Amino acid sequence: MKIAVVVQRYGQAINGGAELHARYIAEHLARHAEVEVLTTCATDYVTWRNELPSGVDEINGVPVRRFRVKRERDPRVFGRRSDRVFERSHSLGDELHWLDAEGPTSPSLIDHLTTQGDRYDYCLFFSYRYYHAYHGVRATAARAILVPTAERDAAIGLTMFQPIFRGVRALMYNSHEERTMIQAVSGNIEVPNVVVGIGSDVPQNPQPARFRRKYEISGPFAVYVGRLDKNKGCPELFEFFQGYLHDPSGSLTLVLIGDSILPVPAHPRIRHLGFLDDTDKFDAMAAADLLIMPSYFESLSMVALEAWALGRPVLANGKCDVLKGQSIRSNAGLYYETYAEFREALRAIEHNQWLSTALGRNGRQFFREHYSWPVIERKYLDMFARLSGEPAGARMDPLPGWLERRRQNLPAAEEVLAALPKGPSPGERRNSAVTAVTETRADSVPTPSPGTAARRESRPRPGSSSRHRTPHGRGYGRSRGSGGPAR
C-alpha cells in the first residue's frame, strides 16, 4: 500500500500544529506502508516564500517531494478578500479568489496529483482551508482522505468547502467538536469518518529537576507552551495572571515557552524562556504544577494531551469548544470563561494537592486510552481496510460554470459560523471518579468538579464574548471581554 501525505509545509524545523501532525502521521504510517510526503518549498506560513529546493528529499526515512509556490502571499490582497467573503454576501468566484490569495499557490503540486495520483492508494490531505487541499482533493477524490484540522473560525463558513467535506472518501477528525461542526455546515454525516487526533512521543522519564537547575526556577509554577500570539489568547492570559498576582495566598510563577510576537509583561513571576527543544519542553511540563491553555481556537490541543500524558492537570479557556470538551471527556482539566473562574480554578489546583493529583491521574489514563500511538495507528489502518472493501464512487460535486460562480448569492461566512452549534460534543467515556469524590469533599479552598468551570456567578453564555479571528488557521496549541481582574 502506498500513501501520499499532502501538507502545506513539512520539515523537522517546522513546528506548526498541522504540519507537525502530518509529519508524525507520515513517520508512524511508514512502519506499515510505503509513504511519500508531497509539500511545498515554503517554510514561512505568512509569506509562503520558496526557501527550500524543489525535488525529492528524505526526512527521518520518509521521502519528501517538494513543489515550488507560484507567488508569495500579498497580505493586503488577502486582507481585502478575507473581509469580502467573511463579512459580506459574495460569490463563489470571490471565495476561489480568497483561496488563491491565501495560498500556498502551487499549481505544480496539483499537476503532480492530477497526473500521478493513481500511483497512490490513498492521499491524506492535511488542513482543509489551503490551496493544496482544496484543489488536491478535487484532483484525487476517489482516493482522498481529509484531515481537516478545522477550527471554529470564519473560513469554515465558506460555501466552497462544503462539496470537499462531502466528496472525499473519508475524514479523520481531530475532535468530536470538529466533527459536529463540519457535519453541521456540510451535511456530510454519511461520509466514513473517525475521531483520531494525534499522538505524541512523550518521554517516559523526563527530568523536572534538570529543568529547574538549568533555568533557575524554584517554587510552584504554571506553564504555557506555544506561540505567544493574540490568536492564542495570550493577552487575556497576561491580564488574568497579573490579576492573580495580587492574591497574597498565591505563589505560582507563570513560565512561558515559545516564540513571541507580543510584548511580555515585566514581572519577576512571569518568565519568558523562548523556544525550547523537546527535552527542555518536556522537562518543564513535568516540573510544572499545571499547564494553562488560553486559546480561543483549536482543532486539537496537542500540548494539553502531552501535559496529560505527563500527569499534569490543565486549566483551559472554556470559550474554546474543543478545549472545554477535552476537559470534560478526560475529567483531567478545569476550564474558565471569566477572570473570577480563572482565579478560583488556579487557586484550587495550587492549594488542593488531592485534586491536582487526581486530575493528573485521569489525564494519564485518557491519553493512554485514546492518544497513544498504537491507538492512533490502528484507527488509520482500520480506515484504510474499510475503504479497500468499499467502491470508490465519484461523489465530488463539479465546480459550477463561469456565470454561476459570479452570482452574488452566498452569505457572509461569519453569519454561517454564528449559526453553527456551539459547546462541547459527547465523545469518549468520561472518567467520573474525581467528580464523585470532589462533590462530597470539603477543603479550605473552593474545589470545582473537574471538567467544569470553577465558578458560576456572573457567567456569560458560552460564545458570548467579543469576536476573535485567526487569519492563518493555526489550530493546535502546540510548542504549535468583560470580567477581567480588578486593578
What are the functions of these language-model segments?
Residues 296:
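Aromatic "clamp/platform" in nucleotide-sugar-dependent glycosyltransferases that forms part
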Residues 258-283, 290:
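Nucleotide-activated donor-binding/catalytic signature segment of Leloir-type glycosyltransferases, i.e.
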Residues 313-317:
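Short hydrophobic beta-strand element within catalytic cores of glycosyltransferases
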Residues 364, 369, 374-440, 447-448, ...:
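C-terminal amphipathic helix plus adjacent low-complexity
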Residues 143-154, 161-207, 217:
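Donor nucleotide-sugar binding/catalytic pocket of nucleotide-sugar-dependent glycosyltransferases
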Residues 215-232, 238-242:
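Conserved donor-binding/catalytic core segment of Leloir-type glycosyltransferases
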